[in-house]
Amino acid sequence: AASDVYKRQGDKLVEEAKKQAAEILDRLNPKAVIAVERPGWNDKHVHHSGMGYDISSVTAKLDYLYEEARARGILTIGVGDLGNEMGMGNVEEEVKAGIPNGATCLCGCGGGIATSVKSDVGLICNISNWGAYGICACLAALAGEEEVLHSGEMEKRMIRACVDAGALDPVSGMLIPRVDGEPEEINAYII
């Protein structure tokens, strides 16, 4: 499994990740740490794609940053649409019970895709981007700066730029302007 490389490097990588997490939080002193569509490890510390593949070797260990933020009392918000995202550990058992590959996976670790990384606030939505846009809209409204929000037309341009750069729609597996199966027009409308 891809996570075998990580396990072989083990303690050295773990300590470095923890050290960097502390340094980042010390330097930035954030009021909140928000994870959007960010894979979180399961109870075996393996990161999975939604399909159940081990993606640990290509996933930065931001779980340590998130856990350190929680330990310091910094607000953590997790935005997800499946249950493998950081911060969705609040509904880990529900994900294991109700989501394909929630309790099992294709890599053989035996932990499933359900993340064990919890958050203070979990925002579950049909598409993670939409949840993030909702947070941005609330913050912009509170600050009285709605003009900082992007338009539906900008959303379409961003989606097309992603496709032009090679991003696949994960539902169809095709190079088409969709986000999690939803056409660009629907995504623009949400904005």
Question: Predicted segments — roles?
Answer:
Residues 1-6:
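Short, small-residue-biased leader/transition segments that mark boundaries at the very start
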Residues 30-31:
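Proline-aspartate-enriched helix->loop->beta-strand connector
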Residues 38-41, 82:
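Short glycine-rich anion-binding loops that position phosphate/pyrophosphate groups of nucleotides
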Residues 43-72:
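A short, gly/pro- and small-residue-rich
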Residues 63-95:
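Catalytic cores of nucleophile-dependent amide-cleaving enzymes
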Residues 85-191:
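C-terminal functional extensions of proteins
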